[in-house]
Regions:
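Acidic-aromatic substrate-binding/catalytic surfaces of carbohydrate-active enzymes
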Residues: 2-40, 60-130
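Intrinsically disordered regions, especially transient/low-confidence alpha-helical propensity segments
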Residues: 4, 55, 107, 116, ...
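Extended, loop-rich substrate-binding clefts of extracytoplasmic carbohydrate-active enzymes
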Residues: 27-56, 60-64, 112-169
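Acidic, contiguous internal or C-terminal segments within carbohydrate-active enzymes
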Residues: 70-88, 148-193
Length: 193
């Protein structure tokens, strides 16, 4: 069996830009948003979108075996943007060929297509922001692409991994969720312990 190939590259995707994020976090109450309170501190909200499409370069992480090829975009929340069936020559998850945000996420921008990871709620706050990623090689020739973050609103450290194995027609998802001992506080002032 051929080992799984993994690589990183820049890909150009037609993209509609967002406006700037408000630098002043909103302390909102009673703004119910898809089961949440609507509070967004310490983030700012983006409430404008561009109507101009440009060709933008995004970092892509690829996993490929004899049957499928998967593209993960760490700069867009770590989503699986494309999953291609090499045998049937077609996408097996919805592949949106254009990045065109809509203002439906908790902080504003959200895009359709691919597989989006959500924590602590639907259309998570950082769904349109960069996340950390790492690659893990396994002895059997498999490769895992991990994406994750420590989310400052709730102090959750979350990682999602996709493992692609040689000779298999599917990818195996895995998740790790850790409640950090203290909330991450993004401020410049003194804090008490």
């Amino acid at each position: 069996m051929t080992p799984v190939k993994v690589w990183q590259e820049r890909v150009e995707i037609p993209t509609y830009e967002t406006g700037p994020q408000d630098i002043h976090p909103m302390f909102l109450e009673n703004r119910v948003y898809q089961g949440s309170s609507g509070a967004v501190y310490p983030y700012g909200v983006t409430d404008t979108l561009s109507e101009q499409k440009t060709l933008k370069s995004w970092q892509a992480v690829w996993l490929e075996n004899d049957y499928i090829k998967v593209m993960i975009l760490p700069e867009l929340g770590g989503r699986v943007h494309r999953a291609w069936d090499k045998v049937k020559q077609r996408d097996f998850v919805y592949h949106n060929e254009v990045i065109k945000p809509a203002l439906v996420g908790l902080l504003g921008p959200w895009i359709s297509g691919g597989i989006e990871f959500n924590w602590p709620q639907h259309h998570r706050p950082t769904t349109f922001m960069p996340v950390d990623f790492t690659l893990e090689a396994h002895e059997d020739g498999a490769q895992t692409g991990w994406v994750g973050e420590t989310e400052p609103m709730h102090g959750l450290q979350v990682m999602t991994g996709f493992t692609l194995r040689p000779g298999r027609r599917w990818k195996s998802p895995a998740a790790s969720i850790t409640a950090t001992p203290r909330r991450v506080i993004s401020c410049g002032g003194p804090t008490r312990q």
